[in-house]
């Protein structure tokens, strides 16, 4: 009788509509008997491979220097589903809700500060994968998105070292696309911009020499913090750097699909300029197979609706 009760409760708890999916993996200290609720934290390498064995995943490997906005981007991508409505991409669950909420809490508690800074992802942290289960209306399909949070220190250590890249970023073999962040504020100073372009080129060259590389790999170069440079990009030098960024990567086009985006994660729902891409547009580009990837990603700020008071501090 007791076992029957446990089974019935288990079925209710892990219904897909609850937004919590059953996990068959356990971490040290978890009880393996009776009802086991998933921790909901970020996944480690072992848990990622266990998840990929059960489900088809769309892994997006996010790399970039420390402070370039990678972790903020991931937190705000999750928060987008809490504050905006969209009829095409619907949030339908996550194995790592607690992990996302942990990231988002740093932004919430920093809401009164001039600058919002998330703690750096420690290099030795093994839990670095975040899961989003989405439903795509246009294709009537589900998509399990995995976002990897590769520490900035790992980026620096691996950008010119193939062996370290293969040993420390083992998820490249699973990645559907690689996203390389450039701190948008670097565009304001010539030396910093040249260094950022050089680092990005160097990483792409190392990826191409990696054992995990596949011809035709999707690489998206994302310039972050567009809201901090949008008022300055009327400066001819800054404008020229942004307009000519593609010229710096032409030699890699033959075996990589490289695209370029500018985003402002914290002020995403404010339409700041024609050159920026909303988080929703970027996510749609990544997951909606019905869209033609060769088409230019268009802004759709007019279609976004803020449906709650969540994080209204971002309007300041």
Question: Model regions: which residues?
Answer:
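Conserved beta-strand/loop subsegment of P-loop NTPase cores
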Residues: 177-179, 208-225, 230, 250-262
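Inter-motif core of Ras-like GTPase G domains
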Residues: 160-188
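N-terminal pre-Walker A segment at the start of P-loop NTPase domains
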Residues: 21-51
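Switch II (G3) loop of P-loop NTPases
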Residues: 141-164
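Canonical P-loop GTPase G-domain recognition
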Residues: 228-295
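Conserved glycine(s) of the Walker
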Residues: 68-69
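Flexible phosphate/Mg2+-sensing switch loops adjacent to catalytic phosphate-binding sites
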Residues: 81-123
